[in-house]
Amino acid sequence: MIPRKRYGSKNTDQGVYLGLSKTQVLSPATAISSSSDSTPLPTPVALVPSPPDTMSCRDRTQEFQSACKSLQSRQNGIQTSKPALHAARQCSEFTLMARRIGKDLSNTFAKLEKLTILAKRKSLFDDKAVEIEELTYIIKQDINSLNKQIAQLQDFVRAKGSQSGRHLQTHSNTIVVSLQSKLASMSNDFKSVLEVRTENLKQQRNRREQFSRAPVSALPLAPNNLGGGPIILGAESRASRDVAIDMMDPRTSQQLQLIDEQDSYIQSRADTMQNIESTIVELGSIFQQLAHMVKEQEETIQRIDENVLGAQLDVEAAHSEILKYFQSVTSNRWLMVKIFLILIVFFIIFVVFLA
């Protein structure tokens, strides 16, 4: 048997392992002969199996209970803060609505300024009637929309007034009143601009009629005859009239065309003035609505003023009662004597019995 060479073992002779390999199995006779010939082998060391891995247990009941308590307290905090969140949400909705109305008011003011510049022009040849009519229609629609938005905002304040605080309701009412006043001033400016436009249209019409009206003497008269002599025969008179009518046809057609143009221009200006008058009437209805809303706010302010006056009267009455009580206390000398005697008695008791 050829022994196998192994390295790194202390039981080897010059690095050669003389024993059996792990894959070889000895018979009993061979084991006896080998044990008698060679040195005795060391006794095998029994390998103790390693204990199985055991998971360490730790009581975490307290941690679980503390986590449950913290979660429960967090849920209770959320439930208690729901009214505050609801009030904040309502305040944010009101702020967004008021901001939107303010932005629309500023845009409408810019359009009104442009309309004012165009309406104050008095030139006959630089009259932008189409642009003025478009701006008038747009501003009228914007004013109607703003009026509806402010009414919705006021309804929102009324609906949420009982749920919000007194100071928040007062602040909301103040904002609504300021928006209403801005809309009223803008409507008044729009009405004045329309009145200026109406006056300018009247002046333009008068000037156009003055310059376009031709006197009767300036109109060319049809001649009675071609030769200037008296006409005896009816055929010659008819022929002369035919010739005269043929000669006057171009001028007559031009005058008729000018009359048609004047009629169309006057009709367009009449339509424009009618639109302006209808717009002024609509603005009057908007003013009535704003006056009604301001009247309601005035009643609210009057109630607040009455409450303030009542509180002031109560404070003055309480102040007078306190002054009376103070005068009665200061005038009562026996009370001062009694207090002094009580202090002396307590001092004597303290010195005699406790010292």
Curated annotation (Swiss-Prot):
Cellular localisation: Endoplasmic reticulum-Golgi intermediate compartment membrane; Golgi apparatus membrane
UniProt xrefs under InterPro entries: SNARE, Syntaxin, Syntaxin-5_N, Syntaxin/epimorphin_CS, T_SNARE_dom
SMART domains: t_SNARE
PROSITE patterns attached to this UniProt entry: SYNTAXIN (PS00914), T_SNARE (PS50192)
Membrane topology: Single-pass type IV membrane protein
Domain t-SNARE coiled-coil homology, first and last residues per copy: 263-325
UniProt topological domain (Vesicular) ranges: 355
One Pfam family from the record: Syntaxin-5_N
Keyword Phosphoprotein: no
Coiled-coil features, chain-numbered ranges: 287-318
Stored Gene3D superfamilies: 1.20.58.70
GO biological process entries: early endosome to Golgi transport; Golgi disassembly; intracellular protein transport; positive regulation of protein catabolic process; regulation of Golgi organization; vesicle-mediated transport
Transmembrane stretches, start-end: 334-354
Family membership: Belongs to the syntaxin family.
The protein's role, per its UniProt record: Mediates endoplasmic reticulum to Golgi transport. Together with p115/USO1 and GM130/GOLGA2, involved in vesicle tethering and fusion at the cis-Golgi membrane to maintain the stacked and inter-connected structure of the Golgi apparatus.
PANTHER family in the record: SYNTAXIN, SYNTAXIN-5
Name this polypeptide is given: Syntaxin-5
Organism of origin: Mus musculus
Name of the encoding gene: Stx5
